[in-house]
Amino acid sequence: MGALVLTGCSERQEASTTLPTTEAAPTTEALPTLGPADFPVPEEAREQTPEGAVEFVRYYVALTKHLAVNSRDPEPLLQLSQDCRTCNQIAQALTADLAASYSYREYAYEFDEYGPALVDGETAEVGFAYVQGPITAVDQAGQIVPDRSAATPEELQSGASLLWNEDLQSWVITGLTVG
């Protein structure tokens, strides 16, 4: 009986003409686009990490400029926030600018994070310095609108509270303090 088993294993076998594939099935799907089509939320800002939280706030600040300079509907600011009073005020100001046909000749700012975000599960806190200005808003006649402009740069100690939104696979801002 033992001889049969050994003999069967020692017989010559033809090699397979096909090799197993080494391609792995994709483990993650691409994230759906979030934000305006011409200024989407970058992938690194959609990571549930301290770095991702900082990049999300950096993006949100840049989005505000993008919408203002391009005279665009501020709806993306609202879509990327949740119960954020300051976010709502910014969106209302941009809506008022659109209604008044204001445009921006100049819109400079700097965003400097204080370090990594503090992440605790589904929430994060990001501290940053926001240097605003110069910003020059003009009316239809090209006249400067003083209450929508800032002639000299001003550093404002700022911060943001974030919540991870599983449906969006992104952070959303729940609180924003500028200054």
Feature names for model-found ranges:
Residues 35-106:
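Core segments of small alpha/beta cavity-forming domains
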Residues 13-14, 121-179:
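Exposed beta-sheet edge and beta->alpha loop/turn motif
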Residues 99-105, 115-116, 150-152:
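Short alpha-helical linear motifs
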Residues 110-119, 162:
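Short amphipathic beta-strand and strand-loop transition segments with alternating hydrophobic
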Residues 16-17, 104-109, 118:
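Short alpha-helix boundary/capping motifs
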Residues 27, 109, 153-155:
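Short solvent-exposed loop/turn micro-motifs enriched in small/polar/acidic residues
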Residues 2-55:
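Juxtamembrane and targeting peptides
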Residues 94-95, 110-114, 144-145:
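Short structured motifs
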